[in-house]
Amino acid sequence: MAGNDCGALLDEELSSFFLNYLSDTQGGDSGEEQLCADLPELDLSQLDASDFDSATCFGELQWCPETSETEPSQYSPDDSELFQIDSENEALLAALTKTLDDIPEDDVGLAAFPELDEGDTPSCTPASPAPLSAPPSPTLERLLSPASDVDELSLLQKLLLATSSPTASSDALKDGATWSQTSLSSRSQRPCVKVDGTQDKKTPTLRAQSRPCTELHKHLTSVLPCPRVKACSPTPHPSPRLLSKEEEEEVGEDCPSPWPTPASPQDSLAQDTASPDSAQPPEEDVRAMVQLIRYMHTYCLPQRKLPQRAPEPIPQACSSLSRQVQPRSRHPPKAFWTEFSILRELLAQDILCDVSKPYRLAIPVYASLTPQSRPRPPKDSQASPAHSAMAEEVRITASPKSTGPRPSLRPLRLEVKRDVNKPTRQKREEDEEEEEEEEEEEEEKEEEEEEWGRKRPGRGLPWTKLGRKMDSSVCPVRRSRRLNPELGPWLTFTDEPLGALPSMCLDTETHNLEEDLGSLTDSSQGRQLPQGSQIPALESPCESGCGDTDEDPSCPQPTSRDSSRCLMLALSQSDSLGKKSFEESLTVELCGTAGLTPPTTPPYKPMEEDPFKPDTKLSPGQDTAPSLPSPEALPLTATPGASHKLPKRHPERSELLSHLQHATTQPVSQAGQKRPFSCSFGDHDYCQVLRPEAALQRKVLRSWEPIGVHLEDLAQQGAPLPTETKAPRREANQNCDPTHKDSMQLRDHEIRASLTKHFGLLETALEGEDLASCKSPEYDTVFEDSSSSSGESSFLLEEEEEEEEGGEEDDEGEDSGVSPPCSDHCPYQSPPSKASRQLCSRSRSSSGSSSCSSWSPATRKNFRRESRGPCSDGTPSVRHARKRREKAIGEGRVVYIRNLSSDMSSRELKKRFEVFGEIVECQVLTRSKRGQKHGFITFRCSEHAALSVRNGATLRKRNEPSFHLSYGGLRHFRWPRYTDYDPTSEESLPSSGKSKYEAMDFDSLLKEAQQSLH
């Protein structure tokens, strides 16, 4: 109830207030002053009788009651399609068009705008229509509008207030009644407010255009006769809908204000009505209406649809040249850098570098992106105001230019140019000259690079087959050539000056090796290095880690021996640093190794602790061996400017050369078949185990002499030397058969033929054995060839065991084709494992390492048990073989076969038992005391072994004794420990070998313990 009473009371008070106001408006200024004094916070100058009613008085100021439900806050004044002509405005425009058609064109001239004669410069209307919504104070209107005694409403106000009845408005316009100056003073802002309010409230929807609006558009776009009027109020448009595409694009966007207006509404209307000489009020109304329409439809235009500026230099705020240029020239770098994108320019070029890792370059590409002014001599070139903005040009080129799929040899070059206040013609001439010079320089560099790629000697790497295929100018921080074989040699980047241009340019130095290797042609160096300081780039990791310093002759050599091969990175390109080389620890930290697999050899390890350092000490004269005609062994001669320290050879090559000097009979073609292993563990050397065809052949032909064994080793073991070798032999070797050499070499072909016939191809026969050796968890020697540890070949053990037995063993050896040809008179050929084991334990880099363990570990053990050789059981290969055998026994894959016939060979036994599954190892051993034979068969799968144990007895022939099969191991060679498992008691040693407590049972041990306590 209280709320309703208050609402009713408020309605009554407001109604009485508005009635008093409407009655006092006829009284002139006194009534208005009284109302303003009573309610100073309300601006009543915009109120009218048609605007009020008790229901909607709390709403906003309205033009028409129908538009009160639309909220103006939902529209943004910046919307380009905000101001549209709706149905009500179409009615207004129809009335105005009908009125304007009757007006002769002579009346619409300079006389219609008297304020222009006085030289007034109207100010630009703000971009947003919101400030125009604010009503001016009554005091300001009082100053602008003098008082008048006329009481009737003006013709323009009647027309605008009666928008719903266009016919009545047109009739009222023809009457030409006089209007009150006081009423005009209190409502001079009203047309602007009505336009603003309506435009804010209407939905920006496109509607069909009516014909009267088209006629009004024709009239309003007619060319005015006076140029000053044309310049002051440019050709307006009634609606954004009537603009074409071309006009939308040609709108002047550089004017800070969205449109020019002849004058603000209050000024124009007040000054039109302020002249006391106006004798024809209808004519003044027409002028004011024309001015209002021009203002309204220019005000409705968005910023991009404004008409173009007039070319005449009228002192206007919008068309002023200084105002046009000022927004552009105020912050030119900001506009420039918003358009310039580093990543876009980098991706546009075909650059073989990772731009996200600038630390991998000698000079990061981002260091050149700072715009630098060109240091040209200042010339008297006063630029006009139109050319006051400085033009900047950023060129990103790769030197030389990429002319196809061939990658560029030089890294990115960024050239930032800035032309400051140059005349157009002079600037063009200078640019053309500079472009010609740059093109000539780039052509020269390209020719030099092609010559550099052609004349650089091949290094045996894949990319040297194509002379110009230099893959990259980025050197990741690695230390091994084996891990990065595709990386090229050192690339030295220099800071190349191009005339007076200080922009950075990374360039590779070229060198010529035509006449003499290592000699540097002074022409290319003198042409490239007179001014720029050499900046040593990252040293190629394949050179630094492996010790092969086939250095680029143009690379500067530091005087210090310690830092001669360290990684060097230029921290700055300033002249103060010059050619200073930095410490290794600092530069590696700066380079970083992000994204790389952590190597076992740390990159920060000093060069003196080279993990690839060979054990064999070589003199400098031994670096060039005549037996290895490879380009890799050709060192570059030291240049006068470089250090006189001889380049350090690759350790693996050096070790290989040392072996080749002793074993000169090794064909050169086999030297590169298998990579010699390093003595120590290096960068992922276990990934580099190669298996060429020669290695597979050596694996099968284990009884043959090792390929790369030293002469002294061959002499120690009494092995026959090849024909080319004239070294003396031991006396023990003189009793051998004279046809020993020929039979060895001839038997090679026989062995290969027989093995291929029986086992098939070499790869398939050896595949299973290799997999078995690699799957073992005890496979702790990663460099060791699987053939070294899997020397338990089936066709060697039996013949080695039967050497002492005489003719039967010799015949059986001939049957197998691999038995040593020496008879009983010839001292037995000790297993080549003694000498070759020493070689293997010293260094596994010998190419004959696969034949080090060519004799079975079990056979070695048998020899050791019977004191037939001084071979040691502690070599890694023997321990490894024992572990593998124990693992196979534990998995149940070893089958022990007893009671074999005397003529049974390992080949025959394996052939019979292959029906159960794949056999990894087959041995036939002879008991020396009794002459009985037994065998061991190791299957790959335990299921196959179990099947052979169950059904293996059925494989015997009629004249053969029955087989006794069981799971077993090498128990018969371990009598002290396995006496209880032996089939016969006489084979066991006397039981006295046992201790006292081992022979006692538990009760006896308990009694003995109790007695000892007392």
Curated annotation (Swiss-Prot):
Residues 113-138, 165-212, 227-283, 307-331, 369-477, 516-563, 592-653, 715-745, 780-886 are annotated as: Disordered. Residues 412-429, 606-616, 726-745 have a biased composition (Basic and acidic residues). Residues 893-967 form the RRM domain. Induction: Induced by fasting in the liver, but not by cold exposure in brown adipose tissue. Induced also by saturated fatty acids in primary hepatocytes. A motif (HCFC1-binding-motif (HBM)) lies at residues 683-686. Keywords: Activator, Nucleus, Phosphoprotein, Repeat, RNA-binding, Transcription, Transcription regulation. Transgenic mice overexpressing PPARGC1B exhibits increased expression of medium-chain acyl CoA dehydrogenase. They are hyperphagic but lean, with increased energy expenditure and resistance to obesity. This is Peroxisome proliferator-activated receptor gamma coactivator 1-beta. It comes from Mus musculus (Mouse).
